[in-house]
Amino acid sequence: MNYILIGVILGIVQGISEWIPISSKTQVLIVSSTLLGLSFNVAYSFGLFMEIGTIAAAIFYFRSEISGLLKALVRMSSRREDYLLLKFLVIVTIITGLVGVPLYLFVISLPILGLPMTVLGVVLLIDGIVIYLSRKNYFPRKGLHDLKLRDIIIVGIAQGLAALPGVSRSGMTTSALILLGVKPEEAFKLSFISLIPAALGAISVTVLFSKHEVSQAVHSVSLSGLLISIVVATFVSIFFINALLRFARTNKVVLLVIILGIMAIISGILSDIAKGFY
């Protein structure tokens, strides 16, 4: 198959699946194994490397928030929200690293698939039913300023678990925030911004510990194919970030939580199916 076409397909898969509760790693694993015949380790490393496109999309879409973060970092911001977001990202990223790096090193030798996402999906479905039954008394209303240290640590752990194949990073973090009572739009926004340092760290770890696999992956699809996949993933990601945030603003919490739950269960099932590819 033409490497340019492969790059476009992989870019679309990455750009869509990164932002919804279906593991982008698993989908890229399936596509790369089917189209390129890559082994598990090579395909997994390639999937993480492709997140360059989604990082670029997040930085572009949230450029105002990123600017505020940089100002807060050098103590030049006058906005309390910038410092709260900086604190949130620092803690979440540290916890993500402490949980995610050991899991990644473990995954290289022993792939674990869909169970975590399936369990999360069931929990979300139950939560959706609870919210519906108690909707007069309960509604996710928390914002960033309401999050306690314990809440932020939980989000970091949830994001770290996404190092496992079959576990969606956005699904874990968004779901954790909503289950903690954060309003949907804020939950999606915090989840998407959290991607930036987490994905940069994942790419660094991949290059550091899996140089051979990354080299094989790039060789399999060609450098031009890889670059095309990154560009396509960037543009597709921008579209999906905007669409998901617009949907979150509708405040259809019950529908949103149930959709997240169903997609998480589907992700778990797809991950188990993907086992046959490697």
From Swiss-Prot:
**Known catalytic reactions:** di-trans,octa-cis-undecaprenyl diphosphate + H2O = di-trans,octa-cis-undecaprenyl phosphate + phosphate + H(+)
EC number(s) from the headed UniProt entry: 3.6.1.27
Its membrane topology, per UniProt? Multi-pass membrane protein
A Pfam family: BacA
Q: Where does it reside?
A: Cell membrane
InterPro entries assigned: UppP
The terms under GO molecular function for this entry are: undecaprenyl-diphosphatase activity
Keywords assigned by UniProt? Answer: Cell membrane, Hydrolase, Membrane, Transmembrane, Transmembrane helix
Name the Gene Ontology biological process terms: peptidoglycan metabolic process
Q: Which residues cross the membrane?
A: 3-23, 42-62, 88-108, 112-132, 152-172, 190-210, 225-245, 253-273
Q: What class of enzyme is it?
A: hydrolase
GO CC term (a single one): plasma membrane
Q: Which family does it belong to?
A: Belongs to the UppP family.
The protein's role, per its UniProt record = Catalyzes the dephosphorylation of undecaprenyl diphosphate (UPP).
Q: Which NCBIfam families match?
A: PRK00281.3-5
Q: What is this protein called?
A: Undecaprenyl-diphosphatase
